[in-house]
Amino acid sequence: MSGLIKTAGLQKLAHYKRIVVKIGSALLVEPQTGLRAEWLKSLINDVAKLHQKGVEILLVSSGAIALGRTLLRLPRGALKLEESQACAALGQIELAKTYGDALAQYGLKTGQILLTLLDTEERRRYLNARATINVLLRFGAVPVINENDTVATSEIRYGDNDRLAARVATMMGADLLILLSDIDGLYTKSPHRDPTAEFIPFIASITSDIEKMADVAASELSRGGMKTKLDAGKIANSAGTAMVITSGKRMNPLAAIDRGERRSFFAASEKPVNAWKTWISGHLGPSGILTIDPGAAKALESGKSLLAAGVIAVDGMFHRGDTVAIVDTNGVEIARGLVSYGKNEAVRIMGCKREEIESILGYEARSAMVHRNDMVLRCLTDST
């Protein structure tokens, strides 16, 4: 399959009110020569044209560490954590200046937002970040968002900007998330290694069969690979945000989407979750795991709460109100929610009926281990 394609459900970009565009390091920075200035100018030209048509654009941009590294002329090879953070500090200033100067050519302002994982995982900080970005958009500015790599550690980081972009898209209620990548979409296998790989232009929902393709069709250049892009899609689609994966190697990559260049379109859920459940669903790192029996799994599918009686194993370390993943006996995540008990209590009461819990804990039992109002179901079908 080659040339221009039609993708069911994808409209011209000017029809969307709010779009988040994720830009990877490999697109923005050449290891030897530094910033790809001409490519960035072409992207900003696309952004400016959409902005003139009333579309709000948010840019989630990698590249700070890579740019800082080229500025320091560091040799190839792994960097220590503090070296990466120093590169990020140098590169972030240069990156912000570059975006600011490029957008200024079109009379546009830009505002830099540096986020850590806790800024989207803690409810109050999440709401504050959302309010700040909304004000920037109201002022007509183009927010440029990145992970705050100068302070993020392995324990408190997104790890890739695909999922950060999805979190931003759902937080801001974006209509469309565009992941500009080194690969032009989703394939059944790796197109770099297998000429029989089939391109998939339209994905109605990200099922387990679709996820299996990510293991064999991963990008060879992208840090996150196809798996993190599908993780991003699950976060975005469940909240009502559609997603596009396409090659960012082309000049004017957003205009290329409108021209019909190859891309994969992931449809938004027809029944998006509400804002509260969007926040729950988007949690990237659940604090614990509750394994449940088949009867409990069926109850969740029918919209019931998770009772302690249906829990057969408890893992991780969590407190009341933390986010936990709920998995079946095969280890497949079927839901995610806010737990009503801490780890120690959950271990003591798992498998117990409600009337038994009070005597075990010494106080009146709460209605559920995870209440349905604090729970988001994952895709449970295997069909594509």
Curated annotation (Swiss-Prot):
It comes from the Bacteria. Pathway: Amino-acid biosynthesis; L-proline biosynthesis; L-glutamate 5-semialdehyde from L-glutamate: step 1/2. One of its GO terms (cellular component) is cytosol. NCBIfam families: proB (TIGR01027). SMART domains: PUA (SM00359). Catalyzes the transfer of a phosphate group to glutamate to form L-glutamate 5-phosphate. Residues 287-364 form the PUA domain. Its EC number is 2.7.2.11. It catalyses: L-glutamate + ATP = L-glutamyl 5-phosphate + ADP. GO terms for molecular function: ATP binding; glutamate 5-kinase activity; RNA binding. Keywords: Amino-acid biosynthesis, ATP-binding, Cytoplasm, Kinase, Nucleotide-binding, Proline biosynthesis, Transferase. GO terms for biological process: L-proline biosynthetic process. Belongs to the glutamate 5-kinase family. This is Glutamate 5-kinase. It is found in: Cytoplasm. ATP binds at K22, S181, D182. Pfam families: AA_kinase (PF00696), PUA (PF01472). Substrate binds at S62, D149, N161.
